[in-house]
Curated annotation (Swiss-Prot):
The keyword Cytoplasm does not apply. The chain crosses the membrane at residues 11-29, 110-130, 136-156, 181-205. N-glycosylated. GO terms for cellular component: L-type voltage-gated calcium channel complex; plasma membrane; sarcolemma; T-tubule. It is found in: Cell membrane, Sarcolemma. Belongs to the PMP-22/EMP/MP20 family. CACNG subfamily. This is Voltage-dependent calcium channel gamma-1 subunit. Disruption phenotype: No visible phenotype. Keywords: Calcium, Calcium channel, Calcium transport, Cell membrane, Disulfide bond, Glycoprotein, Ion channel, Ion transport, Membrane, Transmembrane, Transmembrane helix, Transport, Voltage-gated channel.
Length: 223
């Protein structure tokens, strides 16, 4: 591989590494969405909640605005966190009135785990490609990274649909919501992993013949 392509590959792998770190942060943190109920009286305590793929945390925040809304209130202070019941059946998750979409939650978590698995396998291929004449391993690595990005954006969409159904449900007290920084990390990771995988595939392809009478086999090998 030429020095120019080597430099491009290294820069691309750096951005992919950043995407992998963001994906890991998004999966293990609990700030995908923030939920809050509607207040019936002034000067009430707002029970805001934030949750991720695995657990949910609640905190009571004093609200003094006049619109009786906890919208965009950030949970702070002492928090009460609990894993979703379908991930930890032995733990009581009835710490507050909350309705989850079990199928959506399990699907989003499972797809996110697949994404991390693709990142790990792609990283192994990329690491092995630095050996002598193993540039061909960059091609499967690029595909694994692209698949990881696709899995991550699917997980994001499943989570978004879960929040939407939760808010629209008649059995929940939560009427306000917004997506937080873990959700943003997942979206940024998708962009870096998917585009990084495509660029890595492009840079790892063999040099095309420069003249019509050349074939791929006759072209000068790259070092």
């Amino acid at each position: 591989m030429s020095q120019t392509k080597t430099a491009k590959v290294r820069v691309t792998l750096f951005f992919i590494l950043v995407g992998g770190v963001l994906a890991m942060v998004a999966v293990v943190t609990d700030h995908w969405a923030v939920l809050s109920p509607h207040l019936e009286h002034h000067n009430e305590t707002c029970e805001a909640a934030h949750f991720g793929l695995w657990r949910i945390c609640t905190a009571r925040v004093a609200v003094h605005n006049k619109d009786k809304s906890c919208e965009h209130v950030t949970p702070s202070g002492e928090k009460n966190c609990s894993y979703f019941r379908h991930f930890n059946p032995g733990e009581s998750s009835e710490i507050f009135e909350f309705t989850t979409q079990k199928e959506y939650s399990i699907s989003a978590a499972a797809i996110a785990i697949f994404s991390l698995g693709f990142i790990i396998v792609g990283s192994i291929c990329a690491f092995l490609s630095f050996g002598n004449k193993r540039d061909y391993l960059l091609r499967p690595a690029s595909m694994f990274y692209a698949f990881a990005g696709l899995c991550l954006i699917v997980s994001v969409e499943v989570m978004r649909q879960s929040v939407k159904r939760m808010i629209d449900s008649e059995d929940t007290v939560w009427i306000e919501h917004y997506y937080s920084w873990s959700f943003a990390c997942a979206c940024a990771a998708f962009i870096l992993l998917f585009l990084g995988g495509l660029f890595l595939l492009l840079f790892s392809l063999p040099r095309m013949p420069q003249n019509p009478w050349e074939s791929c086999m006759d072209a000068e090998p790259e070092h």
